[in-house]
């Protein structure tokens, strides 16, 4: 038996749907300024005011900057390692970042002192003043380097090879007439290129009277005929033996 929904409840649902559609259709069109105002953002003035309020009490905030310049010369390059860190006493943090020199080690998850791990901060910067841009632009090939399997040592050449188009002739079993000497000379004088050249018949060549050369010589033809006769004689004797 199907449950019957009371009529007032159906009317209430229809009325509710109608009200929702009316609100959606008749709602105010939002402008771009109103759209931007819905986002929470801090202006530049708010940031300046915030930092100024924290900077008034000099006894609470202690800014210490340690710069460590270390230049190493390797292939004409100098690297400068600079570590800048900031710690605030208001946070009651006793963990200071450690600046390490060359040769020092810090503990890892496998070995070493774990108390110093995670506190080291080293930023590597490239000193552009000491870099020779002309030297970087020229590729340097190491003669002592070994080639990987499958690689071939090639010399870098800037010359561009000239384009030589090739003409592929199709293989056919037809007998082609032997051209005259003058025609071969004209073909050698033709300039090959990518442009399509118009086709012209050779006026000096007689296309009606063409001397065809046989595929086999007279001796080869005689041998073929002799073999065919022997084959016929052999097949005839076999037929006679079957009848007997």
Swiss-Prot record:
InterPro entries cross-referenced by the UniProt entry: IFTAP
Molecular function GO labels: intraciliary transport particle A binding
Gene Ontology CC terms, in alphabetical order: 9+0 non-motile cilium; cytosol
Tissue expr: Ubiquitous.
Protein origin, superkingdom: Eukaryota
Keywords per UniProt: Phosphoprotein
Designated name of the protein: Intraflagellar transport-associated protein
Organism per entry: Mus musculus (Mouse)
């Amino acid at each position: 038996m199907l449950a019957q929904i009371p009529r007032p409840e159906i009317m209430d649902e229809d009325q509710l749907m109608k009200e929702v559609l009316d609100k959606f259709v008749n709602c105010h069109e939002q402008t771009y300024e109103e759209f931007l105002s819905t986002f929470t953002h801090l202006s530049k003035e708010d940031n300046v005011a915030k930092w100024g309020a924290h900077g008034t009490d000099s006894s609470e905030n202690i800014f210490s900057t340690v710069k460590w310049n270390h230049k190493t010369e390797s292939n004409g390059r100098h690297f400068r390692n600079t570590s800048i860190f900031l710690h605030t006493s208001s946070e009651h943090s006793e963990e200071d970042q450690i600046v390490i020199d060359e040769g020092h080690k810090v503990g890892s998850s496998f070995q070493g002192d774990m108390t110093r791990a995670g506190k080291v901060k080293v930023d590597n910067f490239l000193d552009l003043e000491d870099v020779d841009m002309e030297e970087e632009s020229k590729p340097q090939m190491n003669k002592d380097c070994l080639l990987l399997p499958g690689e071939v040592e090639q010399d870098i050449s800037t010359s561009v090879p000239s384009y030589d188009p090739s003409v592929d002739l199709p293989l056919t079993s037809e007998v082609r007439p032997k051209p005259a000497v003058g025609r071969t000379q004209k073909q050698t004088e033709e300039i090959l290129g990518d442009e399509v050249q118009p086709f012209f018949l050779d006026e000096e060549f007689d296309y009606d009277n063409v001397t065809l050369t046989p595929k086999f010589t007279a001796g080869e033809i005689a041998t073929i005929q002799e073999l065919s006769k022997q084959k016929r004689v052999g097949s005839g004797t076999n037929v006679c033996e079957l009848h007997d």
